[in-house]
Amino acid sequence: MQLGFLKQFQKHKKESAFIMRKQTKLVAVVSASALLALGASLTSFAASKGTWMMVDGEWYCYDKNGDAYENTFCTSNGKDYYVGDDGQLVRSAWVEDDGNYYFVNSAGQKITNDWRLTAPYDDDSAEEQWYYFKSNGKRAEDEKITYKGKTYFFDSEGEMLTGWVQKSGDGWDEASTADVKGTETYYCDETGVRLENSWVYDYAPDVDQDDINSDDDEHWYYLKSSGQAATGKKSNVKGQTYFFDEEGKMLTGWVVKTGSNGYTQAWNDDDDTDGHFETTLSELNASEIHFCGDEDDGHMKKDKWVKAYSNTQYGEDDDDNDKYWFWINKSGDVYVPDDSKETGIGATRYKLDDCEGDTFDDQFKEDNYDDDDNTIGLTMYEKKINSKTYYFNANGQMLSKFVKTDASDEEDGVAKMYYLGGWDDGYRKDGSQTIKDEAGTAARFYFATSDNKDEGYFNAAGINGAKSGKLYSDGLLVTADDDKYEIKDVTIYTVAEGQTTATAQVASYIVNKSGSIQTAAKEYKDDDDVVVDATGFSFSGTKGALYKSFNTSTVATGSNATK
């Protein structure tokens, strides 16, 4: 449900409701005047207490002795009429009789089961209020009334209540406390109707709306079928799930469970602070973590990816902050790794800085791109989602770009480089990949498509060694840099059958500018210059590695390219 649209609708409703009520009651007053005109055509008629007579244009009710009744109701044809202290028929006015309050219309008749918009009984200059007069004509006071299937509340002065209404002793009054859970608290719209199964956007019940200050904020509330504000978790509100705190305020952004039924926001929405929430999602140790969007949305997200600010930065007005991808399951739980149930692995994040660099440190740079605590090393957790493999940090933020695991955390002792795609991608890649460095230069990578550890292939990890006639290091294609042919060293890790840990060996390869491995025992020239002299050498079963102790010093290169 788009609550932002509803907010605009409620504003329009407030503007039109008062006009509607005035028009409705005006019709009732005119009709009563017509009745009076009809009665005025008579000079006298019988009443239960005596006889009505018109004298000098005014109606009086006389007893059998000919004395005019005063300050009492006289009944005629089943209708009650009131005569005042001068005996005259009272019209369109309040009447107080034996401590009870009534209202007579323009015909002088006591109204019953009807409404009046009028000034209070004892103050004609005060603002008009709505009053309801029951079947006996008495003003409704300190009570709840059902009228045409709708519920209304009235205070001790009989004024119809709107906005937040609370039980006060044996009666009802404007709300004075924000405690909607431990009190009978309801909300009535501008027409006085108690809202049920409805949303309302307003200040908290304890806010004096005649004295609102900058610290007061409006919030969304949901009024259940009972009329009371929802607290805790409320499911199936037009098919969506929402969360509310103990005061009934709809929770937004990051929401966590605090007790058996309680929920709270895990971010700082106080405009008077710097907006920074100190506790990360992993530090909360909450049994439930949800994401509910902003106040114009508010429902719990589920079975989807969401891109949002971390909870420690959510609500901050800072353009330097980054959004992260989070995964939410079908139950609406945000995935945040649980160390009691799963084991993470140490890793370092990298970005491809210069794919043409001579060394790993030239090619890759450590990167703190994806964590609000500004760290590079991290513990990452593997999770399969929709048949794809993703990695997350301890706060549930999806990782991207390159990550290289810590060898000490790997059972086989091999550090593995993975590629997780860009910011809006994130799943672990395998096979051949073309990736651009920071300067926009495209580089070719290859990541193993399965485990073949005895040949040095580890599933989805960047290959170290030969694959399909090409040479790779941490998955990056190794090519000749300055000369047409060059010797390149790569450390190869293999796990022999029946073993659990890997053996490392440095292998030397002859490669050309395209990264193709050369396997002929001959002189390799760049123009007329011999740049690699491999005559007399053999090539091993490591798919093209030079055979002499894998030591590059045994092969002549450049100006010393001789046998």
Residue locations for each model-derived region?
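Extracellular adhesion/carbohydrate-binding repeat motifs centered on closely spaced tryptophans
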Residues: 2-563
